[in-house]
Swiss-Prot record:
Signal peptide stretch: 1-27
BP terms from Gene Ontology: cytolysis in another organism
GO CC annotations, alphabetized: extracellular region
Full protein name: Uncharacterized leukocidin-like protein 2
Gene3D superfamilies reported for this sequence: Leukocidin/porin MspA
Length: 350
């Protein structure tokens, strides 16, 4: 009887210990979960605060920079999208306040997107009824509107660039000194730098030979286009060509190589990053700039089905452009859009 009582007491004691242990574990787990949740909320709030600060700083800000003891940078951004042409202009205006220089200084970075507007079309009235319209050229044009007191002193990129990726850095030092180098990174100490970086695989960037102190133009033009196992020049009428019995007038896309193999600038579009450095006489309070983004399209015309008829190539046959006029207030360091216009014109040299 005594042994049975001892076993019962021991069993009750073990159950009590197990229950106490489980309760302690659950309490610790709940406390840890609470700590983790508090930590997560703290991190999330910190990240949100940091994100808000970065966003606000990027949009409109005045921040000190290494351009001298009392130098500072005021940043403005203007964005304009045109639905009809599917072109977006995003311009960054960096006003450099340099007390050691007797002129206003401005860096304008031209960004945004020019969508490819790649299209397959059917034109039953023609023998070569299956058409492919693709972006053979992209153009960015920047000019000072009728104001001799504001001048363009430098630009990026310069000359002709054929590499798949373009990277360059512009550097400004106190006293109005400036420099530019290939690659990303500061070019010297005690300077303010701005970089450009964009992809142009199978295309070339060409800075127009007619550039002057009030006008600069960049052309990004298709060269040798690679798709799948093929490599063909833009001037080759057999570019993207496909001769197959399954192609019909109702399915023009089947007369050409699969679009998923096309280079990114053909398939999706182009994201420009071009830079202009300007100076302005302090007696001049306002200046207007006209910025034009243009997409030129070549048309390839194929006859559906198995045949021996040659394809037809028509260069720069169509185009779309977005023209925006911006006004800079030098005294208040502000920018506003004063005019916007778009049409279906391609860029023509001359």
């Amino acid at each position: 009887m005594k042994n049975k009582k001892r076993v019962l007491i021991a069993s009750s004691l073990s159950c009590a210990i197990l229950l106490l242990s489980a309760a302690t574990t659950q309490a610790n787990s709940a406390h840890k979960d609470s700590q983790d949740q508090n930590k997560k909320e703290h991190v999330d709030k910190s990240q949100q605060k940091e994100k808000r600060n970065v966003t606000n700083k990027d949009k409109n800000s005045t921040v000190p920079d290494d351009i001298g003891k009392n130098g500072k940078i005021t940043k403005r951004t203007e964005t304009v999208y045109d639905e009809k042409t599917n072109i977006l202009q995003n311009l960054q205006f960096d006003f450099i306040d340099d007390p050691t220089y007797d002129k206003n200084v401005l860096l304008v970075k031209k960004q945004g997107s020019i969508h490819s507007n790649l299209k397959f079309e059917s034109h039953k009235e023609e023998k070569n009824s299956n058409w492919l319209k693709y972006p053979s050229e992209y153009h960015v044009d920047f000019q000072v509107k009728r104001n001799p007191k504001t001048e363009i002193l430098d630009q990026l990129p310069k000359n002709k660039i054929s590499t798949a990726k373009v990277d360059s850095t512009f550097s400004y030092s106190s006293g109005g000194k400036f420099d530019s180098t290939k690659g990303i990174g500061r070019t010297s100490s005690n300077s303010y730098s701005k970089t450009i970086s964009y992809n142009q695989q199978n295309y070339d960037t060409i800075a127009s030979g007619k550039n002057n102190n009030w006008h600069v133009h960049w052309s990004v033009i298709a060269n040798d286009l690679k798709y799948g196992g093929e490599v063909k020049n833009r001037n080759d009428e057999l570019l993207f060509y496909r001769n197959t019995r399954i192609a019909t007038v109702e399915n023009p896309e089947l007369s050409f190589a699969s679009k998923y193999r096309y280079p990114a600038l053909v398939r999706s579009g182009f994201n420009p990053e071009f830079l202009t450095y300007l100076s302005n006489e302090k007696s001049n309070e306002k200046t207007q700039f006209e910025v034009t983004y243009t997409r030129n399209q070549d048309i390839l015309k194929n006859r559906p089905g198995i045949h021996y008829a040659p394809p037809i190539l028509e260069k720069n046959k169509e185009g779309q452009r977005l023209i925006v006029t911006y006004e800079v207030d030098w005294k208040n360091k502000t920018v506003k859009v004063v005019d916007k216009y778009s049409d279906n014109k391609s860029f023509r040299e001359g």
